[in-house]
């Protein structure tokens, strides 16, 4: 199995199928469309293509794509849409092992953390519908379950016929309270009507009942203070009254419209022969050795006989569109200048809107970005509008529904470790959910990022601004926040059910504390209010927001809403997406903001990473900001070196011979000739208007002189730049996707070494002290000489063995087929590189080689920056 990845077969689908824009395929059958691969927001593809939203979903061989960071089994919204909107169940076709993993995902996203399911029951009227009656697929708990009867194989009855496109959009955005099993809102209104028509005797009886309810409520609230989990209590400040800590389990269950995840879906499992029987007439065959699925169904021959026909052949490893991250230099050569305090909306809609992205935004503080619930491919979105995502160094994760966390995992795998801000409860759900999807341990996932835990009831300083976080009213633990900076403030609601009637009802039932009720009903005294207006009953009804005073609506921007559901003449407005619509608040900059800007920029420069804090003062005193207009020459070839530069904004192009590289914020240039001597070897020109941080020659040498690590870094880099290391990395299937900064960091840990023909690189059983990038020649594994040889661009090395401490032993023996050249990397250096580049670490994980691009076509690096 060590070499299975090299032997895996990739082919194009064949037969009758529809390819989906976001990835995956839909194959027609007697049972309706069968979808293979389930990427985030996949139902939007069906809606946009005007095809029926499938009820049968086949999970691919790998549930998560390491290359793109995309979840290939995002089954949440297909299940939600079919269950809540179309009133029917879905069927998931997969292996037994995949079923167990998917159940963990739905546990977290539908029911919340396991400790939230202690058996508490919310008393209310119920009219639960058996939705399984409308499902065309019978529940099968194992692959040996009997096939469906002919009656069960029939399409859904007319009442659940697939709606038209217009009906789908209306259904997906209407008030779905009539789907809600508990009818909380209706109960409040009914009670109000009854109170107006009762007799005096009944009024007295009602008053007595209300007094009794109040006593029971107080008693229940006293009991709740001891019911709350001890670990959950630790998320609240020591000054937060223990009696006022919310019972989120009760609040979540009040909003929940089901009692078990099995109400939403069934599983159909592949048997030991790789066959999943959907019915007597329809089967899916999984041929693992060929990496494919086959859809087969029986057709009548006309003589009472049936013949099995092949409908389609689909790859079992779904390829998703690879969003090549490139910084745009269009838009009149202007580069985005982030506000000191403001918001850039990436997406403003929800998971059922085919025309818009799910809600997520960048909160700008001191020109640094904090991404809140990043939508999928959010970095590509920003870069397409001229915003380097290196400007974003924090993520706020509000909760673990797919429309809010799908892009979070992807964002964690980008350049540098990012800081995640959320509560331990929400982070725990996130790690369990994505640990199950990726099949990686939660310990490993936790090491991919820096965690800053939220403390409820206590101010938190992030990027110089003061944050206060709260738990909202939602079906799983969710946070919102308010942030204060420079005399202005922004409030973000997060996903919440802001409905005064229901909030009061929760208090009346003893589900919500009175102090918490008053908190949610308080006025919004903030400069800007960013509030959700999603699909009730678990979101905020637009009618409630429409009734707000005009003074509030002037400061209110809506998210989590589709455009066609905004009532005309309501005085409400949807937050506009894109950099051009960035909302900037006029605030006074902090007296330290300039120094912070410089230090944050210098922090990203490899050369300065080993510089002690005691030299920070020297850096601040010697750094100078310079501006260059578009087209200006910053450095001319064959001139005397006089300064070192760090890009602060804009894009510059470095031209060395035939090699061109675009550099962006945090990239640097001009260091080589300062340290190694000689004239400038490159031309550097401003592609856009540019601002750089410059250090003159004497100051730069003074800062780095006493740092052995800095000098060694530059020396190694100089040696590798005289090699063809950059071109060689561009031939590797993983390194080719690295940013310029990452490639530079890799160059600094490589050492050239000549290997003779038939020389052994390492033997099986030896300690894994190094790996290598093949620069010239070729190598083979003795354990499997039937493989093609590994040539230029291939990386060889047992990554798991190299990255344990101390390194463990090699499982293979590698021999040179001819005289070769390698770029050697020590295990200890690779570990350090991985710690700063978690996405590359995951791409290498569990490998003994990372193959060269099979077509050996070198990626061009002179048109756009791969980022």
UniProtKB/Swiss-Prot annotation:
GO biological process: adenylate cyclase-activating G protein-coupled receptor signaling pathway; aggregation involved in sorocarp development; cGMP-mediated signaling; chemotaxis to cAMP; negative regulation of actin filament polymerization; negative regulation of phosphatidylinositol 3-kinase/protein kinase B signal transduction; negative regulation of Ras protein signal transduction; positive regulation of myosin II filament assembly
Keywords: cGMP, cGMP-binding, Cytoplasm, Hydrolase, Magnesium, Manganese, Metal-binding, Nucleotide-binding, Repeat, Zinc
Record's subcellular location: Cytoplasm, Cytosol
Residue numbers binding a nucleoside 3',5'-cyclic phosphate 2: 734-851
Gene Ontology CC annotations of this record: cAMP-dependent protein kinase complex; cytosol
GO MF entries: 3',5'-cyclic-GMP phosphodiesterase activity; cAMP binding; cAMP-dependent protein kinase inhibitor activity; cGMP binding; metal ion binding; protein kinase A catalytic subunit binding
Annotated residues for binding of a nucleoside 3',5'-cyclic phosphate 1: 607-721
Major place of residence: cytoplasm
Entry's pH dependence statement: Optimum pH is 7.0.
InterPro entries cross-referenced by the UniProt entry: cAMP-dep_PK_reg_su-like, cNMP-bd_CS, cNMP-bd_dom, cNMP-bd_dom_sf, Metallo-B-lactamas, RibonucZ/Hydroxyglut_hydro, RmlC-like_jellyroll
Cofactors demanded by this protein: Mn(2+); Mg(2+); Zn(2+)
Listed Low complexity bias regions: 121-146, 191-220
Biased composition range(s): Pro residues: 147-160
Compositional bias ranges of the Acidic residues kind: 221-232
Protein EC: 3.1.4.35
Residues covered by region (Disordered): 121-167, 180-241
CDD domains: CAP_ED, DdPDE5-like_MBL-fold
Catalytic reaction list: 3',5'-cyclic GMP + H2O = GMP + H(+)
Cofactor note: Divalent metal cation. Can use Mn(2+) or, to a lower extent, Mg(2+) or Zn(2+). Half-maximal activation occurs between 10 and 100 uM of Mn(2+) whereas maximal activation occurs with 10 mM of Zn(2+) or Mg(2+).
Segments for region (Phosphodiesterase activity): 357-503
Binding site for a divalent metal cation: 399, 401, 403
Domain notes: The beta lactamase-like domain catalyzes the hydrolysis of cGMP.
Described function: Phosphodiesterase specific for cGMP, which is activated by cGMP but not by cAMP. Involved in the degradation of intracellular cGMP, contributes to the control of cGMP signals.
Protein family according to the UniProt entry: Belongs to the metallo-beta-lactamase superfamily. cNMP phosphodiesterase family.
Protein name, UniProt field: cGMP-dependent 3',5'-cGMP phosphodiesterase A
Organism: Dictyostelium discoideum
Organism lineage: Eukaryota, Amoebozoa, Evosea, Eumycetozoa, Dictyostelia
């Amino acid at each position: 199995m060590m070499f299975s990845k090299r032997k895996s077969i990739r082919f194009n689908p064949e037969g009758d199928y529809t390819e989906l824009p976001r990835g995956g395929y839909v194959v027609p059958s007697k049972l309706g469309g069968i979808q293979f691969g389930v990427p985030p927001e996949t139902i939007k593809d069906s809606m946009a293509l005007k095809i029926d939203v499938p009820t049968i979903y086949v999970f691919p061989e790998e549930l998560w794509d390491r290359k793109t960071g995309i979840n290939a089994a995002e089954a949440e919204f297909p299940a939600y849409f079919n269950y809540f909107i179309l009133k029917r169940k879905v069927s998931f076709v997969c292996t037994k092992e995949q079923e167990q993993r998917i159940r963990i995902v739905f546990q977290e996203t539908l029911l919340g953390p396991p400790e939230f399911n202690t058996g508490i029951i919310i008393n209310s009227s119920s009219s639960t519908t058996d939705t399984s009656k409308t499902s065309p697929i019978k529940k099968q708990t194992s692959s040996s379950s009997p096939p469906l009867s002919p009656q069960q194989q029939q399409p859904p009855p007319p009442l659940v016929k697939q709606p038209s496109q217009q009906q789908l959009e209306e259904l997906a955005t209407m008030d779905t309270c009539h789907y809600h099993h508990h009818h909380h809102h209706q109960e409040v209104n009914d009670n109000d009507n009854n109170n107006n028509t009762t007799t005096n005797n009944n009024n007295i009886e009602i008053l007595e009942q209300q007094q009794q309810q109040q006593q029971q409520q107080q008693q229940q609230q006293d009991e709740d203070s001891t019911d709350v989990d001890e670990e959950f209590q630790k998320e609240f400040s020591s000054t937060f009254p223990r009696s006022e800590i919310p019972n989120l389990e009760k609040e979540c269950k009040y909003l929940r419209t089901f009692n078990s995840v099995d109400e939403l879906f069934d599983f159909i499992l592949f048997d030991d022969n790789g066959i999943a029987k959907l019915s007597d007439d329809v089967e899916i065959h999984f041929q693992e050795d060929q990496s494919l699925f086959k859809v087969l169904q029986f057709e009548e021959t006309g003589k009472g006989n049936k013949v099995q026909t092949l409908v389609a052949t689909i790859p079992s490893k779904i390829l998703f569109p690879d969003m090549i991250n490139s910084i745009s230099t269009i838009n009149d050569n202007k580069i985005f200048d982030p506000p000191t305090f403001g918001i850039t909306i990436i997406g403003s809609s929800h998971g059922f809107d085919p025309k818009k992205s799910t809600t997520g935004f960048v909160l700008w503080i001191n020109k640094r970005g904090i991404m809140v619930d990043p939508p999928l491919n959010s970095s590509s979105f920003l870069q397409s509008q001229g915003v380097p995502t290196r400007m974003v160094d924090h993520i706020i994760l509000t909760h673990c529904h797919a429309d809010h966390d799908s892009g979070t995992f992807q964002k964690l795998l980008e350049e540098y470790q990012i800081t995640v801000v959320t509560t331990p409860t929400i982070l725990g759900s996130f790690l369990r959910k994505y640990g199950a999807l990726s099949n990686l341990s939660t310990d490993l996932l936790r090491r991919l990022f820096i965690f800053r835990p939220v403390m409820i009831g206590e101010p938190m300083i992030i990027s110089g601004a003061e944050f206060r976080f709260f738990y909202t009213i939602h079906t799983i633990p969710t946070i919102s926040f308010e942030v204060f900076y420079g005399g202005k403030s922004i409030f973000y609601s997060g996903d919440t059910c802001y409905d005064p009637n229901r909030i009061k009802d929760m208090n009346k039932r003893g589900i919500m504390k009175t102090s918490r009720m008053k908190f949610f009903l308080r006025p919004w005294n903030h400069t800007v209010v960013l509030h959700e207006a999603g699909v009730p009953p678990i979101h905020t009804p637009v009618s409630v927001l429409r009734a707000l005073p005009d003074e509030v609506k002037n400061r209110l921007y809506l998210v989590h809403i589709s455009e066609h559901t905004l009532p005309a003449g309501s005085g409400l407005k949807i937050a506009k997406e894109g950099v051009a619509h960035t909302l900037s608040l006029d605030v006074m900059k902090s007296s330290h903001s300039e120094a912070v800007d410089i230090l944050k920029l210098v922090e990203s420069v490899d050369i300065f990473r080993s510089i002690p804090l005691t030299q920070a003062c020297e850096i601040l005193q010697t750094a100078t900001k310079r501006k260059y207009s578009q087209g200006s020459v910053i450095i001319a070839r064959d001139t005397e070196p006089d300064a070192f530069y760090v890009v602060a904004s804009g894009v510059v192009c470095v031209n060395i011979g035939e090699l061109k590289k675009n550099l962006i914020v945090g990239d640097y240039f001009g260091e080589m000739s300062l340290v190694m001597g000689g004239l400038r070897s490159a031309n550097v020109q401003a592609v856009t208007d540019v601002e750089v941080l410059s250090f003159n020659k004497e100051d730069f040498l003074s800062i780095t002189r006493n740092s052995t690590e800095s000098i060694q870094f530059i020396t190694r880099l100089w040696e590798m730049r005289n090699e063809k290391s950059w071109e060689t990395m561009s031939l590797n299937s993983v390194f080719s996707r690295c940013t310029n900064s990452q490639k530079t960091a890799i160059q600094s840990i490589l050492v050239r070494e000549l290997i003779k023909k038939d020389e052994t690189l390492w033997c099986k059983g030896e300690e894994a002290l190094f790996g290598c990038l093949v620069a010239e020649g070729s190598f083979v594994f003795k354990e499997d000489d039937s493989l093609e040889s590994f040539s230029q661009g291939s990386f060889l090395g047992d990554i798991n063995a190299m990255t344990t401490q101390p390194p463990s032993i090699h499982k293979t023996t590698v021999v040179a087929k001819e005289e070769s050249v390698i770029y050697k990397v020590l295990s200890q250096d690779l570990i350090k590189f991985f710690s700063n580049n978690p996405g590359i670490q995951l791409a290498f994980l569990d490998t003994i080689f990372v193959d060269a691009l099979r077509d050996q076509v070198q990626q061009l690096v002179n048109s756009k920056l791969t980022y």
